[in-house]
Amino acid sequence: MSEVITQEYTEDGKVLRRIRSFVRREGRLTKGQEAAMKECWPTMGIDYQPELLDWQQVFGNDNPVVLEIGFGMGASLVEMAKNAPEKNFLGIEVHSPGVGACLASAREAGVTNLRVMCHDAVEVFAHMIPDNSLHTLQLFFPDPWHKKRHHKRRIVQLEFAEMVRQKLIIGSGVFHMATDWENYAEHMVEVMNQAPGFANLATDGDYIPRPDERPLTKFEQRGHRLGHGVWDIKYQRTA
């Protein structure tokens, strides 16, 4: 896949059009990333195939599954997996050097509760993630597509929210988003408030303080020093 595709639907559920969400960015792997891919992929990598995953088979236990879309270089995902051995983590990233870097970090940290995929997240969701099975879905700092004419390319749209809803555990599953673009934060809230079957978990306004489980990234620390804001948003599946 060269790009992530989302679909726009008519009211009766027919596909109206398919929209690019973000373009896959291929790059050269460093020798270290390439070595990590070769060494760690057999135990931590999951190849795309159009059949549902069995979490017990994937992780060897029935611990709650946290899925992250677009983990970048994987530093915070590995840290989360290390800090929460009682949970299982699956990261999906289309940028292969990022996957290599994540595997190298995971190997160094000695985590065993992390699996990764290098594929289009929407396609993985459609064909591999069982309904009603995710404890948490994480979407941290997705491409904001800040130009207004590109807003339709943002991954958080109504059809994406519905796909997420189907995969989260009913009554407890949480969709956790974070962005450093205020306009995208507003867009996320607007979309999620329209999406059926979700409730905002914020107790004051639309946003929550950064939860302890989401590590502070270097990028975010720099943003704080420059006075930039970060917005965390959590919605729970209710129906």
Curated annotation (Swiss-Prot):
This is tRNA (guanine-N(7)-)-methyltransferase. The keyword Ligase does not apply. Substrate binds at residues 147, 180, 217-220. The gene is trmB. Belongs to the class I-like SAM-binding methyltransferase superfamily. TrmB family. S-adenosyl-L-methionine binds at residues 68, 93, 120, 143. InterPro entries: SAM-dependent_MTases_sf, tRNA_(Gua-N-7)_MeTrfase_Trmb, tRNA_methyltr_TrmB_bact. The active site is at 143. Catalyzes the formation of N(7)-methylguanine at position 46 (m7G46) in tRNA. It catalyses: guanosine(46) in tRNA + S-adenosyl-L-methionine = N(7)-methylguanosine(46) in tRNA + S-adenosyl-L-homocysteine. Its EC number is 2.1.1.33. It comes from Vibrio cholerae serotype O1 (strain ATCC 39541 / Classical Ogawa 395 / O395). One of its GO terms (cellular component) is tRNA methyltransferase complex. Pfam families: Methyltransf_4 (PF02390). Pathway: tRNA modification; N(7)-methylguanine-tRNA biosynthesis. GO terms for molecular function: tRNA (guanine(46)-N7)-methyltransferase activity. The keyword Transferase applies. Keywords: Methyltransferase, S-adenosyl-L-methionine, Transferase, tRNA processing.
